Structures are given as C-alpha cells and as structure tokens.
Amino acid sequence: MLFRSEVDFGFRATHVTTVAGKAIAAAFYGAAPRRAYFTGCSTGGRQGMVEAQRFPYDFDGIVSGAPVVDETGDAVVLLWAVKSLHDANGSALLGSRELNWVHAAVIAQCDMNDGVRDGLIGDPRACTFDPHAMVCPRGADAQCLTERQANAVAAVYAGPRDSKGRSISVAHAFPGSELNWINNYVRDGGLPSIYAGFMTEMFRYLNFSPDPGPSWQIGRAHV
C-alpha cells in the first residue's frame, strides 16, 4: 500500500508543483509562460526522468543529471556504507584522520596503475588495495588501523552482502573514494553524517509499508 507522501515523492509532487507554478506565473505576469524547463540532479534527476515519462507536456526541455532511478538499490548501498562504518550504538569506527590515512595508502599503492604518477588513480577497478595491510601491532601509534576499522573499510569496498556473504548490489565504493566518505558516511565529533540522517528518515517513513516510524534505527537494520 502506498501512502500519499510516497506517491508525492515518487512522481506527483513535481507535476502538481509545476502546474501550480505555471498558474501563479500567469496570474502575476498576466500571460502564461511561453516555455518551461526543468533541471535537476540525483533525486532531481529522477524527477526529471519521471516527468518526461508521465507528464511529457509539463516541460519543453528537461536536463536530468545523475538520476537516482533505482531508489531501493541506492538506499541499500548507502545504508550498508553508513552501517559498516559505525558500531551498533551509532558511534563512528573511523574519523577523518583515519580515512585520510587510508586514502594516502591507496594512492601510494595504485597511483601508477595507469603509468602516470599524478596523485590520481587512473582505473579504480584495477586497484586491489587491502586495508588490513594497515593493521599495526597493539600500541603502535603510526598511521595504523585496528582490525575492526580495517574490516569496516573492506566492507564498504565490498558493497552490500546478504547473511551468506553474497553480493546483492553491483554498486560499491572503489578504493580512492575515501575522502568522499567524510561527512557523507561518517562525521567527526559524534555528529550524524549526511547519509546517516538521510537513510534514517527514508527507512522510517518511506521505504517500508507500513512505515516503522521513529523506532527504526540504522544499528538494527539487517541487509
């Protein structure tokens, strides 16, 4: 069963807002708009794609950037990354310091996989970095990871898995993307990351039927 808020998020709100916006513009300017254009990215990109399919006469031109056309798959990938990098109580297992260490180690290993040393990884798919190589003996204070931290990084690289360890998504984070995890997946100072907050609200009020509401927590999620 779909609720009105889910239908609105899925397609209705963009169309109704467009119709209302055109009416407001016509009332204010005394003439209907001659042309209407839409541009959006991510969810906005999906909105543009849906508009083109469901309401093709709403706009004369649509630019859809990075459209999220697989809401379920995208949500699972983001949830997996956030959960992997936090403990059951929601505390981050790594911070920006450790992720900078990991990123530097990845660049050091894989920068030359395209034959050019430029601080960039030419083909992240060819980078087989293992974060467990950064695990140091207990008490070492160099740029080291704990076993649990290395497991967390490896889990994000591997992508969502079921209870038997089988991949359930083609999407995952490549080695070299670690700096993008900062604030998006984990955040310093005990604050929730961007996607921790985003995924919490989506799974509470959008992704299930019926919605579990405020009792749902990322730490209790089972992928």
Name these PLM-found stretches.
Residues 7-11, 73-220:
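Accessory cap/linker subdomain of secreted extracellular hydrolases
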Residues 45-56, 62:
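Short glycine-enriched nucleophile-adjacent loop
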Residues 48-49, 71-74:
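Extracytoplasmic/secreted cell-surface and envelope-processing proteins
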Residues 63-72:
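Active-site nucleophile loop of the alpha/beta-hydrolase fold
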